[in-house]
């Protein structure tokens, strides 16, 4: 099986396929974050990195059997700006043909969520030589309007999965797939909370000063004024995290520890 993973991150797709004992002939990855790339190559040294999704030509690759990816969600998330897929001039992008036309005309795009259309471009190009290509796309829960745009573009209805049932995060997600004809059940609740995953011993440099904490609170207030819901939430050990991040900019995962500052 030849696999192409877009927006690959640390290559969780390879972890899942390995757990399922699915043999991979070639695993192509489109990722631009150097830290994510380094982690992937450490865990899976045979991975073939092919760079920016916007420059990807499927004809340069071996025939693809499985396409997976989770395109950026910032402009779609209820916690974000909710501008959707649009240009910097706020022209909404409602189809792949429209996206390609705007791209050829030199328009610049708002944020990164528009990269969904690059996933669709690549899926469409693969379908030309492999109509039976298996695909899986993940994104955040979004407004009905944009979910309908995704459904129409990809040709299947999104499946709502409550990923918080299997993690210590509040993660409701939508998946689009033709694997198993899209018959994907909800996972069983594992009852995971922060106390189940946090380390007992934490180095002191991970604890925030009063000054740093005030700065983070002010940052969230400024985002709220801009109608952008992204910002830190303080949770305790009996909660689920808003989101658990590895690296990246900003601090969202704050946990209150008794007798200590926030971590």
Regions found by a protein language model. Name each.
Residues 1-263:
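Conserved active-site and SAM-binding loop architecture
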């Amino acid at each position: 099986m030849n696999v192409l993973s877009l927006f690959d991150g640390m290559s969780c797709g390879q972890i899942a396929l390995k757990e399922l004992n699915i043999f991979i002939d070639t695993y192509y990855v489109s990722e631009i974050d150097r830290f994510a790339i380094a982690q992937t190559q450490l865990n899976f040294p045979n991975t073939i990195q092919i760079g920016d999704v916007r420059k990807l030509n499927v004809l340069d690759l071996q025939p693809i059997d499985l396409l997976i990816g989770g395109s950026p969600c910032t402009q779609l998330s209820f916690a974000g700006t909710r501008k959707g897929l649009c240009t910097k001039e706020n022209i909404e992008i409602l189809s792949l043909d429209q996206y390609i036309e705007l791209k050829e005309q030199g328009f610049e795009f708002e944020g990164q969520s528009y990269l969904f259309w690059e996933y669709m471009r690549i899926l469409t190009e693969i379908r030309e030589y492999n109509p039976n290509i298996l695909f899986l796309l993940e994104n955040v829960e979004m407004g009905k309007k944009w979910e309908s745009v995704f459904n129409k573009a990809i040709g299947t209805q999104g499946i709502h999965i409550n990923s918080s049932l299997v993690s210590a995060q509040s993660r409701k997600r939508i998946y689009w797939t033709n694997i198993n004809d899209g018959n994907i059940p909800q996972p069983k609740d594992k009852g995971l909370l922060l106390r189940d995953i946090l380390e007992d011993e934490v180095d002191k440099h991970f604890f925030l000063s009063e000054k740093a904490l005030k700065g983070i609170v002010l940052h969230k207030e400024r985002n709220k004024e801009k109608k952008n819901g992204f910002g830190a939430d303080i949770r305790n050990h009996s909660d689920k995290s808003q989101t658990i991040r590895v690296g990246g900019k900003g601090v969202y995962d704050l946990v209150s520890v008794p007798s200590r500052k926030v971590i």
